[in-house]
Amino acid sequence: MSDNVFETLADCMVKSCKILFKHSKNALGLNTHDFDKLFKEIDICNKSNEFPKLANISSSEYIKTYTFKTPIGIKLNSFKEHSEEISCFLNVDESDLRFSRDKNKVYIKVILKKPTCIYDPVEHKRNDFKIPIGYSLETTKLILWDFTASTNAHCYIAGSSGGGKSVMLRVILSHLVNSKSKRDVEFSIINTKRVDLKDFKNAKHTVNYMTGIDGVEDFLENEVDEMERRYKILEKYDCDDLTEFREKEYKIPYRLIVVEEISSYKGNKAYQRFIEILASQGRGAGMLLLLITQLPSHEIMPNTIKCNINTTIGLKTKDSIRSEIIAGSDSGLENLKGNGHAKIFDGYNDGEEIQGLFISKETMKDIITANSKQNKRVKVAVTTKTLDDNKFPGMEVLSSKL
């Protein structure tokens, strides 16, 4: 009699545990999809016939993440090769899937929606040299690019037409005009396409400006000469780089050398030689490149230049081949959706997926106009020529526009 009672009690406890486990899984969302059945049907398993096991599901406003524990022998590519079947199973667009791996765990991420990101001249204004470029789709945190950091020196922005390159460039330049004085940063702009950057010709920060392609060799040669003058000054004052010089001595500004659509200079050996010099030697002198192109192929950006550029902002590409040329294998730029949807690769971010900030032309013009009307008495920048001539630093301003 007592045995029957214990057996009945044990059965009840087992059933209760099963019910509790079932409801726990439902609460965690683990029963939403039968992944075990899916993996068997599409044959994601190892030689021992072991399958991935769903370990966790987490969601944010923008991304839903499925975490799987994978037995030895199952590769990340096994998931990627079946992205179409997995997207159908989850009832989502295939382009919204992201696959990644960390040791024995594989993550399938589903983009639920992209945040709306508008550059706000008040909210996004900063005192440092970090430039807000967008919001992380995974953490929703503001992603900053410090263009003065040695690990981030030089940048190219690349992607297909319509991906958002021009807007990204407008955000970067507008933010610097909005946040930094001319004693901190200045621009040398090659406006190859003659359209998107014309308003910056009138910005206080712009010291050199040209349109089209004629004369680019002389323009860049002058930049190299400026770099050489800066290094002579650094040597004279026993400083390793411009950052140290600015801390110890005077505020020579960082110079951002912007070249829009570098494909226009394909085959121009003089152009490539000067860009190569600036890419390999410019960082210490605070001469930093910002290059824009659809595709930085070898003919447009040789390895002697590309290997010295530490920041890549990749936007949507037509296919994985173009994505690999821009940001390396498995960079996944072909999965981006355009309109500022991007990935950043620099010293702090290894392919962080972001929704880039948007700035309208009207806001950009307002920032430039407001900056040009500022009548505050500000400490002026020192020029390399001033220091070369042994004049008292600060007596000569960089431009009458200051």
Residue ranges and their predicted role:
Residues 1-20, 63-67, 102-103, 121-236, ...:
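P-loop NTPase catalytic phosphate-binding loop
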Residues 12-141, 150, 296:
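N-terminal "pre-motor" subdomain/linker immediately upstream of P-loop NTPase catalytic cores
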Residues 70-71, 207-208, 247:
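Residue-level detector of alpha-helix boundaries and kinks
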Residues 237-254:
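Mid-core helix/loop region of P-loop NTP-binding domains shared across ATPases and GTPases
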Residues 322:
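Surface-exposed substrate-engagement region within the catalytic domains
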Residues 371-384:
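Charge-patterned, long linear interaction tracts outside catalytic cores
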